[in-house]
Amino acid sequence: MRRRSTVILSLAVLLTILAGGASAQIPTKGNVFFGYSYNRAEIVSNDATNLNGWDASLEGKFAPWIGLVADVDGTYGSHISEHNALFGPRVSVSVGSVRPFAELLIGAAHIGIDHGPSDTSFVNAAGGGLDYRVAGPVAVRGQLDWIHTRFFSNSQNDLRFSTGIVLHF
């Protein structure tokens, strides 16, 4: 009986330690962004298309200056649509009411052409932006990203500009 009590107590202590470590890994701060997105998409080499749509992201902070971000967008033209789902690290620093940031993201991209082919590609992106605090947890964001895809076995280098509202928590 004493041995069983010792095993149960040891398991309880181990679970308490593991639970404490796990809770330390859960982000306690971050932000949510939603806004307008403009994508200068290079579908065919040397031929760019203007796409307009939306961009949304969720960032969880693991340190005061580093977080993990998930970013999704959808941009649309007269006969074309492109969607990206990106994930990666973001570094930032708050200086008064502004928070500049830089990010490196990877993920998947999908392009669809009306009455034509569609394709899905690996995507990598690098960029940055600036959040300007308006009041309390509310800020406005300006963001510019270089996005690299390989649709239809060709390399594309797009520029995406996004702006909108950020809620910091």
How does the language model describe each region?
Residues 59-146, 159-168:
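Gram-negative (and chloroplast) outer-membrane scaffold detector with strong preference
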Residues 41-44, 111-114, 149-151:
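A short, acidic/glycine-rich surface segment
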Residues 1-27:
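Cleavable N-terminal export/targeting peptides
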Residues 40-56, 119-121:
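Surface-exposed strand-loop-strand hairpins of Gram-negative outer-membrane beta-barrel proteins
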Residues 26-42, 100-104:
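Transmembrane beta-strand segments of Gram-negative outer membrane beta-barrel proteins
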Residues 23-25, 29, 57, 90:
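Secretion/assembly modules of Gram-negative surface proteins
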Residues 46-48, 151-156:
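A short acidic/glycine-rich loop-to-helix N-cap element
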